[in-house]
C-alpha cells in the first residue's frame, strides 16, 4: 500500500527492544504526529505518553492493555486504542506486524 501525503519524515529510525521494533516519525502539514513501523515476532511492553491509535497495515498482533487480563487480536485494516499515560503488551507471532501509530 502506498499513500501520498505532505509530511516531514524523521529519516533516522527509532530502534527499540534490540531491533525488534523499528519506526520512523512523521509530522503532517497540520502538525499531526504519527509513526510508521514494524515489529518482529516477540512479546513486548510499550509505555504511552499521549493516547495512541494503532492501525494494523499488515501482519497481526495480540494486545493486552494495562489492567486487563485478556488478549485481543488485530489484523490488517483493524485499529486499537491505547490510553495516554498507560502501557500495553503486544505479541507478534509469525509474520512481522506493520503499523501506523496515530498520536493524540
From Swiss-Prot:
Per its record, the protein catalyses: a purine D-ribonucleoside + phosphate = a purine nucleobase + alpha-D-ribose 1-phosphate; adenosine + phosphate = alpha-D-ribose 1-phosphate + adenine; cytidine + phosphate = cytosine + alpha-D-ribose 1-phosphate; guanosine + phosphate = alpha-D-ribose 1-phosphate + guanine
Q: What Gene Ontology terms describe where this protein resides (cellular component)?
A: cytosol
Q: Check the UniProt entry and state the signal peptide residues, or none.
A: none
What's the top EC group for this one?
transferase
Q: Which family does it belong to?
A: Belongs to the nucleoside phosphorylase PpnP family.
Enzyme Commission code: 2.4.2.1, 2.4.2.2
Q: What is this protein called?
A: Pyrimidine/purine nucleoside phosphorylase
Which InterPro entries does the entry mention? Ppnp, RmlC-like_jellyroll, RmlC_Cupin_sf
| Entry function | Catalyzes the phosphorolysis of diverse nucleosides, yielding D-ribose 1-phosphate and the respective free bases. Can use uridine, adenosine, guanosine, cytidine, thymidine, inosine and xanthosine as substrates. Also catalyzes the reverse reactions.
What Gene Ontology molecular function terms does this protein carry?
guanosine phosphorylase activity; purine-nucleoside phosphorylase activity; thymidine phosphorylase activity; uridine phosphorylase activity
Tell me any Pfam family this protein matches. Answer: Ppnp
Amino acid at each position: 500500500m502506498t499513500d501520498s501525503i505532505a509530511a516531514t519524515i524523521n529519516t533516522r529510525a527509532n530502534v527499540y527492544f534490540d531491533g525488534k521494533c523499528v519506526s520512523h516519525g512523521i509530522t503532517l502539514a497540520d502538525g499531526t504526529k504519527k509513526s510508521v513501523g514494524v515489529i518482529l515476532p516477540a512479546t513486548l511492553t510499550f509505555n504511552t505518553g499521549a493516547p495512541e491509535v494503532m492501525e494494523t497495515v499488515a501482519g497481526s498482533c495480540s494486545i493486552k492493555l494495562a489492567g486487563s487480563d485478556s488478549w485481543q487480536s488485530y489484523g490488517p485494516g483493524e485499529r486499537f486504542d491505547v490510553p495516554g499515560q498507560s502501557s500495553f503488551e503486544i505479541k507478534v507471532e509469525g509474520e512481522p506486524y506493520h503499523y501506523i501509530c496515530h498520536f493524540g
